[in-house]
């Protein structure tokens, strides 16, 4: 694992996983390895809760004779704003922040980041710094800057706490750095015909 180094597991602790269901459908463990191989995936980047499955996935690669395994990176979990444990969908309702990218109609219809006025690049910027340090004091990044600055060496092994207020600050900062015309266009798309009651300079 690129982040955690060599991971050793006692083979006696490994159980026999089901690779095919009774209806003939492959399980995740089998399908994801086969798909990643044929898609020529170079890096598998996922949460640390999947680390215990790595030995099994590695053995599936070996059983097929596929020596060109992807590099694995198991990222630290995002933790609750308050209390112990990883962030869950229920925490959004509990602490008053959106969970989904856009509105979601489940048992209860909930608004997403888009409906709350969050810019996509602001949310990506905020999330990128949870568990990763660019090595500088710089916090506000454009997408292209993030691509240039990112490296696995900046990743942390410990979980990062989700801070809704910090998320709002990132969004505020990105809005301030966005041209007025682009902000106006975003408002028009978000509110549809509702924006027509306002003058362009008011937007």
Where are the model-predicted features located?
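Active-site cores that bind ATP or allylic diphosphates and position pyrophosphate for catalysis
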Residues: 1-94, 98, 109, 134
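Catalytic adenosine-cofactor/nucleotide-binding cores of aminoacyl-tRNA synthetases and other
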Residues: 64-203
